[in-house]
Design a protein with these regions (language model features):
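N-terminal intrinsically disordered/low-complexity leader segments
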Residues: 1-9, 73-80
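Hydrophobic/aromatic-rich alpha-helical bundle segments in the mid-to-C-terminal region
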Residues: 3, 116, 147-194
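Helix-turn-helix
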Residues: 13, 17, 21-55, 59
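Short, basic, alpha-helical segments at the C-terminal edge of helix-turn-helix-like DNA-binding modules
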Residues: 32, 61-70, 76
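Amphipathic alpha-helical packing segments from all-alpha helical-bundle domains
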Residues: 69-77, 91, 109, 115, ...
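Hydrophobic alpha-helical connector segments
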Residues: 73-106, 160-161, 188
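Secondary-structure edge/capping motif, primarily at the C-terminal ends of alpha-helices
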Residues: 75-83, 111-122, 172-179
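Helix-loop "lid/cap" segments that line or gate small-molecule binding pockets
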Residues: 98-105, 113-122, 196-198
């Protein structure tokens, strides 16, 4: 008798198939049929969990984004209380960033999917609002840096946060795809590039 999967187990299988397909073939080549075949489930299983492909894609992206946000939340609470010196702040920045970098480098399929989704037509205003909410901890951190460094309040926090996230993710994806030799850049150099706007404003 075939094992019956829970809804969360089915979603996990579908999302992993989406990651693999998007990484291997490009996000525009992902279809419901390919997703079903990729995880060994019949197409009706998908529609029990998601109304359509955009809903599946968006859930896959937001779950990954939430994992990163939760990671940053934990790290920020551990390292940020009581910090009031520039050196301490830069050290905390390195710790937070390093964990994000390790997350990106640990799962190439997920990292490539997330970046391709971000650049695709699937990424719209609603997803952007979720992203702002998920990265509130990082935005608060950037604001703390700004206050310590005397950054003008007119500087857009979201732009700074996006630069950190996007610069780091772009480099990781290029490494996974072979566009950048993984030995050509040290994590410290990638970090310095990602945080260059924040520490030199």
């Amino acid at each position: 008798m075939a094992r019956k999967y829970s809804e969360e187990e089915v979603k996990a299988k579908l999302i992993r198939a989406v990651y693999q397909l998007a990484a291997a073939e490009g996000i525009e080549k992902v279809t419901m049929r390919k997703v079903a075949e990729g995880c060994g489930l019949s197409t009706p299983y998908i529609y029990q969990c998601y109304r359509d492909l955009p809903a599946l894609m968006t859930d896959a992206y937001l779950r990954s984004d939430m994992e990163v946000a939760n990671l940053m939340h934990v790290v920020r609470n551990l390292h940020m209380p009581g910090i009031n010196k520039r050196q301490e702040l830069e050290e905390a920045s390195w710790v937070i960033w390093s964990l994000y970098w390790e997350y990106l480098m640990s799962d190439s399929d997920k990292a490539i999917f997330s970046w391709r989704y971000y650049l695709s037509g699937y990424f719209g205003a609603e997803v952007q609002e979720f992203r702002k909410m998920y990265y509130r901890d990082l935005m608060n951190f950037v604001n703390q840096v700004g206050e310590l460094y005397g950054v003008s309040s007119s500087v857009k926090l979201h732009a700074l946060v996006s630069n950190i996230i996007d610069e780091t993710a772009t480099t990781a994806v290029k490494m996974h795809l072979g566009y950048i030799d993984k030995d050509a850049l040290t994590p410290r150099l990638v970090y310095q590039s990602a945080f260059s706007l924040m520490f030199h404003l």
